[in-house]
Amino acid sequence: MQITIKKLQDLLSSVQRKKIQTLKLKQGKFELLLNKTYKKVNQEIIPSQKSAVLQNSPSTIIKSINNTKKIFCVNEDRTEYATIVSPMVGTFYHSPAPGEKIFVQVGDEVKFNQTVCIIEAMKLMNEIEAEIEGKIIEILVKDGDIVDCGQALMKVET
């Protein structure tokens, strides 16, 4: 199979449309490496629908800012909330050290850039900051739990 300009244009169009970040293509002497970072995705809040269920949330939109994802949802009771998700794999901690005051608990109001937890990854303590203001309505992980990249940590009512 030979790569033509038309096939290459179609491929690049698909990469752009599907927001693919990394693509490596090699065929014979031809090699293409594409790295692209998407900073923002349009945000939209979709009203709840009784027939659809996704993790107890009928509507879900993912927004990426500064490599931290937030999932905006609308509950069945039409409460809008954002879900703070882990930007990395590691161990989740509610407080800066054992025995110290926890960063946030259910019912607390959080401000933009306020530290909400720590994720330890490769012996480094990474402070996770809220990128939205609101009230913590649920903490989805326990202190000391291992979390994956993209895993939901907390729900914040907006």
Curated annotation (Swiss-Prot):
Keyword Lipid biosynthesis in record: yes
Localization: Plastid, Chloroplast
Gene3D superfamilies xref list: 2.40.50.100
GO molecular function, one term: acetyl-CoA carboxylase activity
Pfam families per record: Biotin_lipoyl
Biological processes annotated in GO: fatty acid biosynthetic process
Protein name: Biotin carboxyl carrier protein of acetyl-CoA carboxylase
Protein source organism: Pyropia yezoensis (Susabi-nori)
Gene from which the chain derives: accB
